[in-house]
């Protein structure tokens, strides 16, 4: 039910942002609702206009995952913006569940754009596509060369830290 999804979204939000106790949706004029987050310690209702960008992005992220009619694909542009790296790791763990099991038992394809080496450290090389412009100004998308000896040696040298490996330009995606 919608209530179950809301409760799960609220639970996930409180796990990701521990100082939040709950979500309040006070009714305004003309049957509109506003979003307020309830502080765990003071019980103060914080209007959306006073909530940090990172917390709002996490709320939007969760809303996309827990919407009523789960789509077959969900896209996030620069998921890392405004989000603490520890929270980003937790969000990526949730996305792994969503992409393999789904929220309602149906896996969802997840597409994320990023410029973050931190985020790259949370994914497997076979899940990454590098995007760059060629010399004619056309966008090129390619898989990482995971079968190449050069790539494997470089990945091993960086202890599997794909984000750090990105700086070596061994798989592209860097402006030149």
Could you tell me what each predicted segment is?
Residues 12-15, 164, 171-176:
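Feature primarily recognizes SF3-like P-loop helicase cores of small DNA viruses
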Residues 1-27:
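Amphipathic alpha-helical domain-onset/packing element
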């Amino acid at each position: 039910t919608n209530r179950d999804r809301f409760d799960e979204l609220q639970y996930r939000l409180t796990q990701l942002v521990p100082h939040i106790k709950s979500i309040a949706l006070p009714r305004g004029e003309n049957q509109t609702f506003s979003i307020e987050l309830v502080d765990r310690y003071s019980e103060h209702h914080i209007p959306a206009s006073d909530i940090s960008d990172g917390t709002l992005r996490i709320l939007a992220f969760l809303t996309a995952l827990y919407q009523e009619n789960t789509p077959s694909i969900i896209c996030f542009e620069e998921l890392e913006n405004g989000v603490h790296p520890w929270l980003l790791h937790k969000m990526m763990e949730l996305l792994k569940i969503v992409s393999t099991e789904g929220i309602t038992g149906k896996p969802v394809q997840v597409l994320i754009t990023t410029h973050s080496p931190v985020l790259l450290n949370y994914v497997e090389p076979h899940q990454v596509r590098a995007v760059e412009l060629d010399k004619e100004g056309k966008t090129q998308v390619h898989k990482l060369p995971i079968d190449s000896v050069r790539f494997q040696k470089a990945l091993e040298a960086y202890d599997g830290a794909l984000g750090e490996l990105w700086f070596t330009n061994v798989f592209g995606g860097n402006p030149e």
